[in-house]
Amino acid sequence: MSGPADSIEIQNVVASTGIGQELDLEALADDLPGADFNPDNFPGLVYRTQDPKAAALIFRSGKIVCTGAKSIDDVHDALGIIFDKLRELKIPVDDEPEITVQNIVSSADLGHNLNLNALAIGLGLEDVEYEPEQFPGLVYRMDEPKVVILLFGSGKIVITGGKRTDDAETAVEEIVERIDALGLLG
């Protein structure tokens, strides 16, 4: 039998790394085919990989943020491509720079419509933000795992703030248990 945890899909993984030295982004933009650098709009250089599909935001400080990947493996693969491109340009990069996952955004479907008004009261106002005039979802801040869950009347949810892939699964199991205990699941 499949449940809400089986419907979890990672939508975005954001990770950071660095190469430990300052970069000349103007020169890098010229030397790196496909790089996008417009300092009037954004202080970093944007370099997109196609396989896996991700974007690296490369900053003058040598810090790099990878976003848009669909898995932690994809983050490592995309950053590996970027590290190799930098090495080809004679920019020294450690063999295996440390990569830190900052945020994993996942979605899931609880399979039932939700009464968000009743849920806002039942989950406890101290952990909930629900202003339907401002945003159609209920924002629920969970302590363990430390994630934010957006719940929608359709039963669809978004989990953000995870650091590990299993944070979403734990969060879905926890929220289903809480909603069920309130008698508000289906």
UniProtKB/Swiss-Prot annotation:
Cited Pfam families: TBP
Which family, according to the similarity comment?
A: Belongs to the TBP family.
Q: Output the lineage of the source organism.
A: Archaea, Methanobacteriati, Methanobacteriota, Stenosarchaea group, Halobacteria
Report each sequence repeat as a residue range.
10-86, 101-179
Asked whether the keyword Ribonucleoprotein is assigned, the reply is: no
- Covalent cross-link Glycyl lysine isopeptide (Lys-Gly) (interchain with G-Cter in SAMP2) as placed by the record, residue numbers: K53, K63
Q: What Gene Ontology terms describe what this protein does at the molecular function level?
A: DNA binding; DNA-binding transcription factor activity
Q: Which gene encodes it?
A: tbp2
Provide the function of this protein: General factor that plays a role in the activation of archaeal genes transcribed by RNA polymerase. Binds specifically to the TATA box promoter element which lies close to the position of transcription initiation.
> What PANTHER family does the entry give?
TATA-BOX BINDING PROTEIN
Q: Does the keyword Ubl conjugation apply?
A: yes
Per the record, the domain of life is Archaea
Q: What is this protein called?
A: TATA-box-binding protein 2
HAMAP family recorded: TATA_bind_prot_arch
